Amino acid sequence: MDSSEMGPDSWMKIVHAIAEHYHDYDGFVVLHGTDTMAFTASALSFMLENLSKPVILTGSQLPIGMLRTDGKENLITAIEIAAARENDMPLVPEVCIFFENDLLRGNRTSKTNADNFNAFRSYNYPPLAHAGISIKYDIPQIYHPVSRKPLKPHYLLDRNIAILKIFPGISPQVVESILNIPGLKGVVMETFGSGNAPGYDWLLEMLKDAVERGIVIVNVTQCLAGSVEMHRYETGRKLLQAGVVSGYDSTTECAVAKLMFLFGHGMTPDEVKEHLNCSLIGEITIA
């Protein structure tokens, strides 16, 4: 399957396969196309609650049958990381992406290059490990579960989520068409800089109306690095007053997956907002 066709149904199959064989293996490697790998990694991080074993996603920019493929090294190292243990405990008990020598937290990662082997970056969180002659792990950065509870797989996701990308000259018709999608529950709004958008009266009114109708709007920055701080500028404060929720330093991929996960649990809009304001599995940084 081309990864462009991956989505919630595929994520559920992966979760089911891991849950079914969870006690048979020390770790898991998921081979995945690069285009939507960050979406899948983000979703799996929420869907595999109480995960205590490595789940490493990897793939290649060049098909593995080609002479210069990056796939062989990515696969071999991903397997080594998935099997790595210290004091009889997994070294990396979380969902990660391994690509071009770097191990990255899955829900912090985005695909940032379509042509180079270093296709993935995690700008707001440091790599968990770097592979050279040896693999050097940054242990303090690795997420470790607080307690050893049994794995709790989740299969319910709500797809009534949309992405609204703000751009100069955006029209009322564009915003209205998105905010009035039948059944819409959540919107990931990509804004400028530290969470800013034009202060158009019509835009603020549309956002406020959507929030009052129970639609959760989470604000993430279009920048590759940095965090949303809606208190910093007047334009951001107006979004806050309209009821828009901060996404902090979340990636768009993670924000989409998190909304699908939270609404999939039947949460009310207020409950979803409450969970957006906390880090569930190391996906955001809250100062």
Language-model segment annotations:
Residues 1-19, 205:
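ATP/NTP phosphate-donor binding region
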Residues 30-32, 56-59, 93-100, 165, ...:
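Short beta-strand segments
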Residues 30-53, 199-206:
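Short Gly/Thr/Asp-enriched flexible loops that form oxyanion-binding sites at enzyme active sites
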Residues 105-189, 194, 199-200, 279-287:
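Accessory alpha-helical/coil subdomains and C-terminal extensions
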